[in-house]
């Protein structure tokens, strides 16, 4: 009798897999991550591919999910909405000592098993650089730094509920 009761209890349990502080529903096997088009006014031509690849790598590296083209158990889509450079840290002579590169992405996350986990949210991160530097000379490093921070934020929101 106790064996039957245990089997019934286990059959009704919903398990989740924990990874680096996050959870993935045990029923989830796949995630579809669409390319994030760059809809910002100022366009870095590589940013769409760099960002999308980084997000896929982050999720693939920290979850047991398989990336699929469409109809994933989880779906992540969105667009790059802002890519701006603004002066910060103005000096005494009214010229900026630093510039700030800011990237903003709009993300829509869908969990087919739990719609309470769905969200649509903008994420924004920045990196500063000396105004004496030309953006083109530091852009690749800054984009990598900002992209890593953005993918961490998106991962945490989707899988850590942070």
Protein language model regions, located:
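A structural "domain/chain start" motif
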Residues: 10-53, 57, 64-65, 113, ...
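Sec-dependent bacterial lipoprotein signal peptides
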Residues: 1-13
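Compositionally biased, intrinsically disordered linkers/stalks adjacent to structured regions
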Residues: 139-162
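Second-shell loop/turn segments in exported
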Residues: 37-44, 133-141
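Short loop/edge segments at beta-strand edges and connector loops
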Residues: 69
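Surface-exposed short loop/turn segments
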Residues: 19, 61-65, 73-118, 126-139, ...
């Amino acid at each position: 009798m106790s064996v039957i009761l245990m089997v019934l209890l286990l059959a009704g349990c919903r398990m989740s897999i924990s990874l680096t502080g996050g959870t993935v529903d045990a029923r989830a096997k796949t995630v579809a991550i669409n390319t994030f088009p760059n809809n910002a006014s100022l366009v870095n031509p590589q940013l769409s591919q760099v960002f999308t690849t980084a997000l896929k790598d982050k999720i693939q590296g920290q979850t047991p999910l398989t990336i699929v083209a469409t109809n994933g158990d989880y779906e992540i889509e969105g667009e790059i909405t802002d890519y701006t450079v603004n002066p910060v840290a103005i000096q005494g002579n009214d010229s900026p000592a630093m510039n700030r590169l800011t990237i903003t992405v709009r993300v829509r996350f869908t969990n087919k098993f739990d719609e309470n986990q769905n969200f649509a949210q903008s994420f924004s991160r920045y990196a500063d650089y000396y105004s004496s530097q030309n953006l083109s000379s530091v852009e690749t490093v800054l984009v990598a730094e900002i992209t890593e921070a953005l993918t961490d934020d998106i991962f945490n929101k989707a899988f850590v509920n942070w």
